[in-house]
Regions:
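Short, low-complexity N-terminal intrinsically disordered segments enriched in polar/charged residues
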Residues: 21-57, 170-171
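A short, structured loop/turn motif at beta-sheet edges
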Residues: 107-115, 144-151
Length: 171
């Protein structure tokens, strides 16, 4: 009889563990899908359309940009980064340049209101005639928070240059 109780207890605990794991996995997939649609797709859209205000709206008011991919290792408010990027958005909106950004991820962790996303972004910029001005792959980490039903960037960390091979490995 003790063996039966032990067996049933073990079976019940296993069932509960599997059920919890499946529920967590489904919640993770839902969060990732929501972030893909409402955050990363919005970043890509705003860059492509030159929608500066739309891009700015994806950032938390206290967001920080960290860059260690070039010679100058820096950390500063996203508002400063946005001021530096604004002309590129305006040029894109006016058709003077064509910009595009894509994202791929190697790790995505979080819960209902926080997310830490690790991956690579691929940015291209062409002039109005289609000539390539800039192209680059960059390792990225982003810390996101969900406020009032909207995912916002709290910290973007542009870590290091990546290669096309690194990018392809994340397919």
């Amino acid at each position: 009889m003790n063996k039966n109780i032990l067996f049933l207890t073990t079976l019940l605990l296993t069932f509960l563990t599997v059920t919890k794991t499946i529920a967590q996995s489904e919640a993770d997939q839902l969060r990732k899908s929501e972030i893909d649609k409402s955050y990363w797709a919005e970043i890509s859209r705003t860059v492509k359309e030159g929608d500066f205000e739309g891009y700015k709206a994806t950032c938390h008011e206290n967001a920080v940009l960290v860059t260690t991919s070039g010679k100058n290792k820096q950390s500063y408010p996203m508002t400063k980064a946005l001021a530096g990027w604004k002309q590129g958005f305006l040029n894109t909106k006016q058709g003077k340049q064509l910009d595009n950004v894509q994202f791929r991820f190697s790790q995505r962790i979080g819960d209902e209101t926080t997310a830490h996303e690790t991956g690579i972004f691929y940015f291209t910029s062409h002039d109005g005639t289609g000539k390539l001005i800039s192209e680059g792959y960059t390792h990225l980490e982003a810390l996101l928070v969900k406020r009032d039903g909207k995912w916002l960037c709290l910290m973007e960390y542009q870590k290091a240059k990546a290669s096309k091979e690194d990018w392809e490995a994340l397919k």
